Amino acid sequence: MFDNIDNMARIEREIEKRMEAACEKSGWYVAVAMMTPESTTLHIEKFGEEPVAGEDAQAALDSAVAFAKAEFGTSVEVERFNEKIPNTRAPYHVTFLVKVDASKRVAELAA
């Protein structure tokens, strides 16, 4: 399915561009963390002075899940991590890893 690295990078950029539009209003950073022919993991992260929680975190997660379902139309697994980052101006961050069964959609993007 992936005949070369350039093609895979193009697909990753396209997914990131679409995902950023869903999250940019709340200041979240989005990247494709991992991509295989079977799945894509979206890494969604936000740094802040306090742990990210409540409505802001839920809104970003809802946007990510909605995007993944709309884009790929399949199941979504979500992991959430909160951890303190020492010696930084933004000592807390939250990361959502949204893994989607992307075989059909990735094949379309690769074509």
Regions found by a protein language model. Name each.
Residues 6, 19, 28-30, 54, ...:
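Short, intrinsically disordered, low-complexity terminal segments
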Residues 33-41, 81-92:
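Short, ordered beta-strand-loop transition motifs
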